[in-house]
Amino acid sequence: WIMGHMVNAIAQIDEFVNLGANSIETDVSFDDSANPEYTYHGVPCDCGRTCTKWEYFNEFLKGLRKATTPGDSKYHEKLVLVVFDLKTSSLYDNQASDAGKKLAKSLLQNYWNNGNNGGRAYIVLSIPNLAHYKLITGFKETLTSEGHPELMDKVGYDFSGNDEIGDVAKTYKKAGVTGHVWQSDGITNCLLRGLDRVRKAVANRDSSNGYINKVYYWTVDKRATTRDALDAGVDGIMTNYPDVIADVLNESAYKAKFRIASYDDNPWETFKN
């Protein structure tokens, strides 16, 4: 999965997919009442990027729905996965469940079109704080109570705080999550970060009793770092330059071992090295 980083304006969906992304990451900010409000990152952000592009969250979802609904004039067949980077640090811990409920309602209405031929992309809810695990339970409860538990088949999870892998596993237990787990590791492109924790995450994925299904590394903009991440066995790379990742995947060393995921590739299925 080539994951376009910080895609927060509807116009950027086309831009990143046309550069080679089959997945995008979108920032979601919340208001004081835990309603998802904007797709917005703000300052500071990655070096070389504009930090302030934004849409109203529900409007972004409508644009995203068009981009992922077969037959729509804006449809991109290869856009198959969306990571919502949920900026919950603005909330109190006890608002996490509400944030999940409100997020589910927004997605149900504006992305899934109330279960009636909505967008088809798989969705990863990426949460920065382990203490906010009730966002997951609130989300699940709402889809169930609204009569669409089947949409949970399209939803996966990530805790993005670079926490100890054992602590993440315990948190998923509390949230009742037993699959659909992506594990991120990374840092802003302005700084360097080694691959130690990525290797631990890959080892967990490849073990017989691990909780991780997929591992992705962020934010990678250079060819050398891309090669290092691929050598470590990641499933996804988040980038500001999808074309760079696509170029490296075309190199003879990687062409035989990796391919770009399509809609038929289940993002919740573990593919071991």
Curated annotation (Swiss-Prot):
Expressed by the venom gland. GO terms for cellular component: extracellular region. Mg(2+) binds at E25, D27, D85. GO terms for biological process: killing of cells of another organism; lipid catabolic process. Glycans are attached at N250. Its cofactor is Mg(2+). It catalyses: an N-(acyl)-sphingosylphosphocholine = an N-(acyl)-sphingosyl-1,3-cyclic phosphate + choline; an N-(acyl)-sphingosylphosphoethanolamine = an N-(acyl)-sphingosyl-1,3-cyclic phosphate + ethanolamine; a 1-acyl-sn-glycero-3-phosphocholine = a 1-acyl-sn-glycero-2,3-cyclic phosphate + choline; a 1-acyl-sn-glycero-3-phosphoethanolamine = a 1-acyl-sn-glycero-2,3-cyclic phosphate + ethanolamine. The keyword Secreted applies. Disulfide bonds join C45-C51, C47-C190. It is found in: Secreted. Binds 1 Mg(2+) ion per subunit. The active site is at H5, H41. Keywords: Cytolysis, Dermonecrotic toxin, Disulfide bond, Glycoprotein, Hemolysis, Lipid degradation, Lipid metabolism, Lyase, Magnesium, Metal-binding, Secreted, Toxin. It is an enzyme of class 4 (lyase). GO terms for molecular function: lyase activity; metal ion binding; phosphoric diester hydrolase activity; toxin activity. InterPro entries: PLC-like_Pdiesterase_TIM-brl. Its EC number is 4.6.1.-. Its main location: secreted. Gene3D superfamilies: Phosphatidylinositol (PI) phosphodiesterase. Dermonecrotic toxins cleave the phosphodiester linkage between the phosphate and headgroup of certain phospholipids (sphingolipid and lysolipid substrates), forming an alcohol (often choline) and a cyclic phosphate. This toxin acts on sphingomyelin (SM). It may also act on ceramide phosphoethanolamine (CPE), lysophosphatidylcholine (LPC) and lysophosphatidylethanolamine (LPE), but not on lysophosphatidylserine (LPS), and lysophosphatidylglycerol (LPG). It acts by transphosphatidylation, releasing exclusively cyclic phosphate products as second products. Belongs to the arthropod phospholipase D family. Class II subfamily. This is Dermonecrotic toxin LdSicTox-alphaIB1aii.
